[in-house]
Amino acid sequence: MVRASWFEIPVLDLERAIDFYERVFLVELERDVVDGHDAAYFPAADGPIGAAGALMHGESYVPSLDGTRIYLGVDDVEAVVARAVEAGWSLLYPVTEVDDQLVAEIADSEGNRIALQADAD
């Protein structure tokens, strides 16, 4: 079995990205330096479910709307989308129900495509 265990979201401006993710996702990120790269960690859930990750700034980290898509699990997709749009960022894929899940995609402050996922109620 292969299971995702870690993700890194590339950023050009770490402070701008931290502001975006803290405001849109209502989380507090923890700043650090990893192998010479400025980073900001997402809070990790206890237990084996889900992957932990960080925003990463460095020359090998290039934001993109193309390529691998990360789905961030949230409690309320519509609320996250509303906060992102209110903050001036783009909705790339509208909130849609797929197999008892609500999904959507937004562009973050750095030009990454970020997918959102939650259980449909």
Placement of each model-derived feature along the sequence:
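Vicinal oxygen chelate
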Residues: 2-5, 9, 30-33, 81, ...
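Core segments of cupin and vicinal oxygen chelate
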Residues: 1-2, 8-50
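Short beta-strand micro-motifs in enzyme catalytic cores
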Residues: 38-40, 68, 100-104
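Active-site/binding-pocket entry motifs
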Residues: 48, 61-62
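Mid-chain, well-packed structural core segment of small domains
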Residues: 63-89
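Short, P/G- and charge-enriched loop/turn segments at secondary-structure junctions
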Residues: 56-60
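Short, charged/polar, Gly/Pro-enriched secondary-structure boundary elements
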Residues: 47-53, 111-114
